[in-house]
Amino acid sequence: MRAKKRFGQNFLIDQNIINKIVDSSEVENRNIIEIGPGKGALTKILVKKANKVLAYEIDQDMVNILNQQISSKNFVLINKDFLKEEFDKSQNYNIVANIPYYITSDIIFKIIENHQIFDQATLMVQKEVALRILAKQNDSEFSKLSLSVQFFFDVFLICDVSKNSFRPIPKVDSAVIKLVKKKNKDFSLWKEYFEFLKIAFSSRRKTLLNNLKYFFNEQKILKFFELKNYDPKVRAQNIKNEDFYALFLELR
């Protein structure tokens, strides 16, 4: 069965990487959601260790293969787009996924939106995206994605993954990252906060003040900079994560 470009399919064939994903995912006796199981290389191990595996697969051809190959009683195959699912809030899950790169951000924001039921997620992502998610203050890759993910999750790099670990071979390397939900975080304003970050990073060449002043009170911004000892010409990528959220609360 050939991979389909429209679904962003690249099948993981490296057993060492598969084992690292499973070992880092804390799947033992847990409820697991797998996004895009494909031919089931990862799924076959998950069903042996997890309490229950819910696998979301939108490709009917892959669904047919999985139904033939996996008959475990704790395996539930759902022929549906994960992004369109309305989840039962009474259950808790860990997520494990080798996700299509073109919907990485969408999946992460779906996880944030459903934070009540997702404790952690182990994700295979494009190496470039992993660097952006893991980036720290003053890094060139530091972005709204870095801030939004790191505010709600502790983020860990599990391993780098060569493009040769997939078939067909993609053009870029990948990385496995793990997101662990932070305790006692207020998720209620996450959509509003992300809209704020989009404005803050709308032009990386401009100062943060110039990006924000047409939408928020300029004097409040300058007063905040003075309080936190930031230069008025500071750029968005040079602001600490916790200070960004404090500024957001001050201006909203």
Swiss-Prot record:
Compartments where found: Cytoplasm
Class in the EC hierarchy, top level = transferase
Respond yes or no to whether keyword Cytoplasm is given for this record. yes
Q: Does the keyword Ribonucleoprotein apply?
A: no
Q: Which reaction does it catalyse?
A: adenosine(1518)/adenosine(1519) in 16S rRNA + 4 S-adenosyl-L-methionine = N(6)-dimethyladenosine(1518)/N(6)-dimethyladenosine(1519) in 16S rRNA + 4 S-adenosyl-L-homocysteine + 4 H(+)
Q: Which keywords label this protein?
A: Cytoplasm, Methyltransferase, RNA-binding, rRNA processing, S-adenosyl-L-methionine, Transferase
Q: Which cellular component terms (GO) are annotated to the entry?
A: cytosol
Which top-rank group of organisms is this from? Answer: Bacteria
The function of this protein is: Specifically dimethylates two adjacent adenosines (A1518 and A1519) in the loop of a conserved hairpin near the 3'-end of 16S rRNA in the 30S particle. May play a critical role in biogenesis of 30S subunits.
Family per UniProt?
Belongs to the class I-like SAM-binding methyltransferase superfamily. rRNA adenine N(6)-methyltransferase family. RsmA subfamily.
**What name does the UniProt record give this protein?**
Ribosomal RNA small subunit methyltransferase A
Source organism per entry reads: Mycoplasmopsis pulmonis (strain UAB CTIP) (Mycoplasma pulmonis)
